[in-house]
Design a protein with these regions (language model features):
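Bacterial Sec-dependent N-terminal signal peptides
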Residues: 1-16
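A cross-kingdom marker for long, charged
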Residues: 21, 237-345
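Second-shell loop/turn segments in exported
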Residues: 23-27, 160-167, 286-290
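Extracytoplasmic/secreted cell-surface and envelope-processing proteins
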Residues: 27-30, 57-64, 198-201, 324-327
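N-terminal post-signal-peptidase region of extra-cytosolic proteins
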Residues: 30-37, 161
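Proline-aspartate-enriched helix->loop->beta-strand connector
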Residues: 45-49
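Low-complexity, serine/threonine/proline-enriched polar segments
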Residues: 72-140, 222-272
Length: 345
């Protein structure tokens, strides 16, 4: 009897994940056709979306990572524009969410809510509210609202890191947020993990230093072999570039094995190179280790936070070079079913 109950509980807790590898910037691509992606997301019927942001707690606990200074710069500006004491932020956010639930077209309150989320170091949901205001202004000019947004959020000053400027041509503005709004979702869940960013950067620097010496020395002895490997890498990125310049469905291609292999070669070269004499294999394996650790952390965050939210079907949106790593990790997790966007018909 206990075994039956335990098995039933495990079955009930199964999590389904729709994983989408994306570009972080679609601005230089041809006009993109997202119709199939939208259709598949709607068909999947998710109850939550996860994006590549740090949670409030992680943002406060991680002392440094690639866009920490940018986030602190935004925080400083928005506090100068209008500060809200930290203890008042939860109540302010709840109150504004109540207003917006009653009056979805109150874009002044949405601007206030974006501001409060940013002050609360919840960049994911600050961006979601800012995007809705920005998108409204693109369709319905409103000088008073535009002035209010500029005074409160200073979007023209937020230009680096995961900024408001970057948001406008990102995977969130083009894929996640339109579908979240259509499906009536009010929250973007954070899943990023930056606990190992310093280790990652140190291992990257170690590889670069030793690879430069390896390339200089090896070119004399194994020049043809090394040139052949570099040709393979360069040919891959020519293919990548060709897709980005010509395809109306870049996202679908980014979720293919071909794209994953090419993308990985940019960070990790080719596995065939690792056993070449004097190749910095130990340093490269360390670099790969820290990349896997970040992806493992992201997957763990999805699992734990989906469970806490009571979500059983979730969309996970991550940069293209995360997609295969995360899918492999999710596939090894008990009670998890994962498909990438191309596998969902």
């Amino acid at each position: 009897m206990l075994l039956v109950l335990f098995s039933s509980e495990l079955h009930a807790q199964k999590l389904e994940i729709l994983l989408i590898g994306v570009s972080h910037n679609y601005s230089s691509y041809p006009k993109q056709d997202f119709a199939d992606i939208y259709r598949k997301i709607e068909q999947f019927k998710p109850t939550a979306f996860f994006g590549e942001f740090l949670s409030k707690a992680d943002e406060q606990n991680v002392m440094d990572y690639w866009c920490k200074k940018d986030n602190l710069h935004r925080l400083k500006i928005l506090r100068q524009n209008r500060n809200i004491p930290a203890l008042q932020l939860p109540k302010t956010i709840d109150s504004l969410n109540t207003i917006i639930k009653q009056k979805p077209d109150d874009f002044k309150s949405r601007t206030d809510l974006a501001h409060a989320y940013y002050l609360d170091e919840d960049v994911a949901n600050g961006h979601y509210q800012y995007w809705q205001v920005f998108n409204h202004l693109q369709q319905h000019a409103n000088a008073d609202l535009s002035t209010y947004v500029d005074k409160l959020l200073s979007p023209k000053l937020d230009t680096t890191g995961r900024s408001m400027k970057r948001l406008i041509t990102s995977e969130y503005a083009l894929i996640a947020f339109p579908m979240m709004r259509k499906l009536g979702m009010t929250t973007l869940y954070a899943m990023d993990c930056q606990d190992y960013d310093l280790n990652w950067n140190a291992s990257w620097a170690a590889v670069d230093e030793k690879f430069a010496a390896f390339r200089k020395d090896t070119a004399k002895v194994f020049q043809n072999e090394l040139n052949s490997h570099f040709k393979s890498i360069n040919d891959g990125f020519k293919r990548y570039d060709q897709v980005e310049k010509s395809s109306p469905k870049v996202t679908e291609w980014l979720n293919t094995p071909e794209a994953s292999t090419i993308s990985a070669s940019g960070d990790f070269y080719l596995p065939e190179m690792y056993d070449m004499k004097n190749f910095p294999k130990v340093e490269m394996l360390s670099k790969i280790h820290w990349w896997i650790m970040r992806n493992q952390g992201m997957c763990n965050n999805v699992i734990h936070r989906a469970k806490a939210a009571g979500a059983r079907k979730v969309v996970v949106i991550a940069g293209a070079n995360h997609r295969k790593f995360m899918q492999d990790i999710f596939e090894r997790m008990p009670g998890v079913k994962v498909q990438n966007i191309n596998q969902l018909k």
